[in-house]
Amino acid sequence: MAASLPATLELVADNADVRAVSGAAGWTDRANQALLEGALGVVVVAPEAEPTDELRNTAAEQNAFVILDQRWRSNPALTDAREAVSSIDAPISFIEISANVSSLQDVDGAVHESVQIAHRVVGAVQDLRVLHRQSRTVLLSGSVAGGAPLTISIAVGPAIERPFHLRVFAPSGAVHLSVPDPGTAAPAIVTVLSADGSTTLPNNWESAHRASWRRVIAAFQRGDRPEDLHEFNAASQLLLSQASMS
């Protein structure tokens, strides 16, 4: 594994403090085993939806961390978007998430990640249900903590520059987050609308992947224990209990 990272990280053959595992099926078992073997933390790249109960328990018992490296949710601009949403001085009226994916196999994963992002930026998602589903599109509705309605739409097709969008509307303004494909060098963009006009927040030229590894440094230096698994599990449980993805 190679990356442009601070010098405090280096690749070693054995007994690594941090291990990276693929998020393909079975990743929770692989990550759990890495922690049991003494790793202080695990980075999971592109995790698929799986139960995380055992892994969360192991991480707590070992005082270890698990960081999920995801295509959209790991983008550092989500922090800016969350702060912008929290500064809105009126109740939120509506939240809209839309995303384009390249294949049918990506649809359910995009729904799962969208729920995580809504949770992180706006608030916990509830009452989620499928309104419409065809072979290449899915539309869901729900609400967030506080009662504001939420829609999530995922479509299979070409993404023009930025495949993921989150829009939060309130009587006093709005926040728009657009996240590029992780394979590009473009930054995510956060735009804030108010009575004074439109403001684009300063760009953060850091990829989701690099941001994930920067969080590894923070976990060591400050003892951070990220909420990744909690948010991931909350999305999984919500989709299992309240929305039929078949």
Predicted regions and their residues:
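C-terminal helix-rich "cap/oligomerization" subdomain common to oxidoreductases
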Residues: 2-43, 56-60, 64-65, 214-246
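Short beta-strand elements of ligand-binding domains
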Residues: 43-48, 66-70
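Short, charged/polar "capping" segments at the starts of alpha-helices
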Residues: 50-54, 77
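Rossmann-fold dehydrogenase core element
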Residues: 55-74, 84-97
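A general structural signal for well-ordered alpha-helical segments in protein cores
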Residues: 78, 114-115, 210-217
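Rossmann-like dinucleotide-binding domain that binds NAD(P)(H)
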Residues: 96-170
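NAD(P)-dinucleotide binding in Rossmann-like oxidoreductases
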Residues: 149-214
